[in-house]
Amino acid sequence: MSQNNNETMIADIRKKLNIVNQGLLNPDKFKNANQQDIEEIHNFVMSKDSFSPSEVTAIADELGNLRQD
């Protein structure tokens, strides 16, 4: 359940942030990531209507730290 939930949350984040390089946020790479960390980022992203370029970069960087390559 948590693996699928992580993948769904990452897909939501990727869509909301309109990430150009979709491969950076491949949901498959987050299957085993800490669900609470992903959920915190997901809740933050979903709570906002728009993001500055620096916010998008910071969010992508944080997700990159959680990614399981």
From Swiss-Prot:
This is UPF0435 protein SH1076. Pfam families: DUF1128 (PF06569). It comes from the Bacteria. Belongs to the UPF0435 family. InterPro entries: UPF0435 (IPR009507).
